[in-house]
Amino acid sequence: MRLGVFLHEVVKHLHKLPYRSMLSEKGGMNMTKLEELIKKIEADPQNAEYTKEGIAPLFSAPRKAKILIVGQAPGIKAQESRLFWNDQSGDNLRSWMGVTRDFFYQSDLFAVVPMDYYYPGKGKSGDLPPRKVFAEKWHEETLALMPDIELIILVGKYAQDYYLKETKKKNLTETVKAYKEYLPKMFPLVHPSPLNRRWMAKNPWFEKEVLPEFQKRVQEVIKGAKK
C-alpha cells in the first residue's frame, strides 16, 4: 500500500474514534484547556497509582455537547477498552434514548462525565463506589469546557446525590419517580444495568411513564441541536 493511501486510512480511523473529542476539539483554545485539565488530573496525588500504571482518566467533554451523562465510574471493561458505556448497560441506555451506537459515539452531542474518571476496583458485591471528593475536584472545571449543555442525565444514586443535593428524595426510587420536578435541565434515572430488571419489574411505572418522557426530552435536545 502506498504511504499516502495508508495515512489516509489511518486518519479516517482516528476520526471515527469515540474519544476523539478528548484529543482533538474543534478550536485550539478548548483543546489547550482540555489537555491542561487532563494533565492536572493525572498529576493529582489521588490518581498517582493510575498514572503510574499508564491509565488515563476516562471521560468525554466535546465542546458542542448538548447532553451530559453523569454515572458512577468506569467499569473495568470501559477502562480497558477506553470506551464508555460499551456493554449491555450502554445498549439499554441508548435504547432508552432512542439513538444508535454510532450516533451516540460520533455525534459529539453526548458528554460522559462520571463521578470518578477511573475504575475504582472490585468490592464484595460489585464495583467499589467512586472515590470521595473526586467530583468536587474536577466536575466544575470539566463542565466549563461545555457551555451548551441542555440536559444532564443523572444515572444512579451517586450522581443524583451530588447534583440534586437537598432536592433529592428519600431514596433513588422516589427521586426517579419525581423526575418532573427536575426538568427541563436534569433527568434522574435508575442504572440501565440488566441487574436492575428486578427493580423495573417491581416498578412498572418506570418503563410505562418515565422512559417515554425521557426519550422525548432527549430527542427534543437532539432535534434542537440539528437546527
Which sequence ranges carry the predicted segments?
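Short intrinsically disordered, low-complexity coil segments enriched in acidic
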Residues: 1-3, 193-194
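N-terminal leader/targeting segments
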Residues: 2-5, 20-22
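Acidic, Ala/Val/Gly-enriched low-complexity intrinsically disordered segments
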Residues: 5, 9-11, 25
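Short, Lys/Arg-enriched N-terminal segments with co-localized hydrophobic residues
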Residues: 16-30
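Short intrinsically disordered terminal tails
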Residues: 26-28, 224-227
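A polyanion-binding, active-site-adjacent surface
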Residues: 32-220
